[in-house]
Each structure stands twice: as C-alpha cells, then as structure tokens.
Design a protein with these regions (language model features):
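Bacterial N-terminal signal peptides that target proteins for export
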Residues: 4-17
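Conserved catalytic neighborhood of penicillin-recognizing serine enzymes
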Residues: 120-155, 162
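Mid-domain, small-residue-enriched loop/turn segments at the edges of structured enzyme/sensor domains
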Residues: 153-212
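Short, glycine/proline-biased beta-turn/loop segments that scaffold the active-site neighborhood
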Residues: 105-129
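Structured C-terminal helix/loop/strand segments within mature extracytoplasmic catalytic/sensor domains
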Residues: 30-54, 58, 76, 157-158, ...
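A short, well-structured edge-of-sheet supersecondary motif
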Residues: 48-81, 110-113, 266
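Active-site SXXK
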Residues: 74, 86-114, 143, 276
Length: 310
C-alpha cells in the first residue's frame, strides 16, 4: 500500500506538472497585464469626449460621427465612428489618391477635354477652361482646393466611374466606403441609404493610407498633402478648432440633411500628425449645416487627446 501510494503521488505529480506550469505561466501573464495597464488612456479619453459630443449634439440639434488618431501615440478618440454618414465632397481626396496610385506624376500632365454639357452645379474652375480643357493635375487641384464638382466627375471618369473607384478603395482595404454616383447626385443621401456613404473610421483609415502611408511615393504624397494644405473651403471647420500655428490639410463636404463634413491631417508643432474625421448631419432634409459644430468638435477632440503646443 505504501509503495502504491508513492507511485500514485509521483505519477499524479508527473501528470499534473504541465498543468501547474501552464497555470503559473497564466497567472504570471495575468499579473503582468494587471500591473502594466490601468484603464487605458485611450478609453478614458473616448469616454470624456463622448459626454462632450452628446452635449454638442444637443446644442446643435445634430448628429456627429468622429474618429481621431494621434499617430504619435496611437491613441484615438471615437464617437459613432462605425456609423454611416453621407461623405459628400470629402471623397474627392480619396479619388485623387486613387488617381495618383494608378498614374505616374508625369501622366498627370495629360490634358482632359470636356464640353459645357459636362458642367454640373458647381464649377468655379472648370467653367473657365471649357475651350482648352485641363490637365489631370489641374483637375485634382480644382477638385480638392475648390471642391469643383465637374473636376471631380472628370477624375472619376478617368478612374472608370464610381464602381472602379470603389475597387480602388477595396484594394487598399477599405470595404466600407461605398461610391455609387457622380456629382451632384451623390450629395443627396436619404436616411438608411448606403450609397455614397462611409464611416468616420473608414474615411480616416483610407486618408491615412493615401496621405501618410507608403502606398504612394513620397512625391505623390507630397502633392496630395500640398493640395489639402492649400484648400480654400475649410477655414471655418477643423482649421478653426486648432491653434493658428498648427498646420492643417483638409477636405470639406456638404449635402442634404445639413450634412457638414471635414476630414483632415493636423500637424501640432514638433509632433506626429493627427488624422481627424468629423461628419455631421441633421434630422430635416432642408436643414442648414453648421461650420461651428465642426470647429467645436475639433476642440473637444484635441482636449481629449491632451495635445498642446508644448
């Protein structure tokens, strides 16, 4: 019996040894994890921002969608970041990004001819050059810096239409953004319609891919960012919510239901850039949009990220 007991204990110990070691490893892992992470700053920032965004929605009687990424710290601020909104003219940056991906810089000197019949509802630049046409580079400038709708339509046609633009987005991993129509129809999005919509997170991720990633050459990225930095339509939106000395590259958009959007890259002094997307709309189809809503939301985001001039 004594021998039997010893055999049992030894045998049992051998069988249990791997389990004990695994349990110890697990406990050690759990212990380290608990030591290393008090509630992540990211979560705390999101919760703080969320309360403020709710108050902002009430103040403006609007709906907000926000995604911000500090590329230096990997911290985010999100609010309705996976909900769909009409993207309106913000998509023009992504379309130019897709154009750059598919063409050399030299190919952008190709001149595109068009007629007065191609002009749509907003053509501050293209209407001046019906007789001569414009190069792809000039169309990109008109589309991003002046939000010229005809310029954007001509770029979309160069890509092969909305369906081919969508394929380009899928190739960079954007499975959410849903191009379906040309300007100006794409700005009319009824509640529940997914055409020409995206989410704040998807737009931010695609913007980051084109403007800050390595999918484009440095020369192409610089060209895209330069157009956004010299944008003429965004002074009262994200730009109005950051300190004056910070650099901002952005693209705005507006549409039915008071849609007002801005997608941007922000460079605080001596820090890595912040990617910020703010989308908004209202309940009534004929509602007016609010530029100040976007500026106020920007201030909340930067406060939540604890980004300063220092």
């Amino acid at each position: 019996m004594i021998v039997s007991k010893k055999f049992f204990h030894i045998s049992h110990y051998k069988k249990m040894l791997p389990v004990v070691l695994l349990s110890c490893a697990t406990l050690i892992g759990c212990s380290n994890s608990n030591i290393q992470s008090e509630p992540p700053k990211q979560t705390k920032q999101e919760n703080t921002g969320n309360h403020s965004f709710v108050q902002l929605e009430k103040e403006y009687d609007a709906k907000l969608g926000i995604y911000a990424l500090d590329t230096g710290t990997s911290q985010t601020v999100t609010y309705r970041s996976d909900e769909r909104f009409a993207y309106a003219s913000t998509h023009k940056v992504l379309a130019v990004g897709a154009l750059l991906q598919k063409n050399s810089i030299e190919a952008l000197d190709q001149r595109i001819k068009y007629t007065s019949e191609d002009l749509v509802n907003y053509n501050p630049i293209t209407e001046k050059y019906v007789d001569t046409g414009m190069t792809l580079k000039e169309l990109a400038d008109a589309s991003i810096r002046y939000s010229d709708n005809t310029a954007q339509n001509l770029i979309l046609k160069q890509l092969g239409g909305p369906s081919e633009f969508k394929k380009s987005l899928r190739e960079i991993g954007d499975t959410v953004t849903n191009p379906e129509r040309f300007e100006p129809e794409l700005n009319e999005v009824q509640p529940g319609d997914t055409r020409d919509t995206s989410t704040p997170k998807a737009l931010a991720t695609s913007l980051q891919t084109y403007a800050l990633g390595d999918i484009l050459s440095t020369e192409k990225r610089n060209f895209l960012i330069d157009l956004m930095k010299r944008n003429t339509t965004g002074d009262n939106l994200i730009r109005a919510g950051v300190p004056r000395e910070w650099e901002v590259a952005d693209k705005t958009g507006s549409g039915s239901y008071g849609t007002r959007n801005d997608i941007a890259i922000i460079w605080p002094p001596n820090k890595k850039p912040i990617v910020l997307v703010i989308l908004s709309n209202h309940a009534k189809e004929d509602a007016k949009h609010d530029d100040k809503l976007i500026a106020d939301a920007t201030k909340i985001v930067l406060d939540a990220l604890k980004v300063t001039n220092k």
